[in-house]
Amino acid sequence: MSAKTDEILESLKSLSLLEASELVKQIEEAFGVSAAASAGVVMAAPGAAAGGGGGEVAEEKTEFDVILESFDAAAKIKVLKAVRNATGLGLGDAKALVEAAPKPIKEGISKDEAEALKKEIEEVGGKVTLK
């Protein structure tokens, strides 16, 4: 690596979790990309591989996908805000996701996190399923 990339890497290592989160948001805004989309793809692969065995019924599912099925038209802005808060998406990406329902909001998350997200979105007028 070059000296410049080494220096950047060392700076990143010293960031707190909050600072790293803020940095990700700034990078998403500056470059028009979404870290959540690529993380969702990466996280979906292990879940798909685990589901391939299919023989053991006794094993409890540990990864869940939160699917926005629909929403009340009057609550669209509230649902949009809840989706943005949960995913970290920009306004345009979150709006496209909400308007394209049924669509996955988050994939490969824990049961507790999935149920909390479902409750949050249903409280503002969205209809959500867990898969």
UniProtKB/Swiss-Prot annotation:
One of its GO terms (cellular component) is cytosolic large ribosomal subunit. GO terms for biological process: translation. Transmembrane segments: none annotated. Keywords: Ribonucleoprotein, Ribosomal protein. Signal peptide: none annotated. One of its GO terms (molecular function) is structural constituent of ribosome. Homodimer. Part of the ribosomal stalk of the 50S ribosomal subunit. Forms a multimeric L10(L12)X complex, where L10 forms an elongated spine to which 2 to 4 L12 dimers bind in a sequential fashion. Binds GTP-bound translation factors. Forms part of the ribosomal stalk which helps the ribosome interact with GTP-bound translation factors. Is thus essential for accurate translation. HAMAP family: Ribosomal_bL12. Belongs to the bacterial ribosomal protein bL12 family. This is Large ribosomal subunit protein bL12. It comes from Parasynechococcus marenigrum (strain WH8102). The lineage of its organism: Bacteria, Bacillati, Cyanobacteriota, Cyanophyceae, Synechococcales. The gene is rplL.
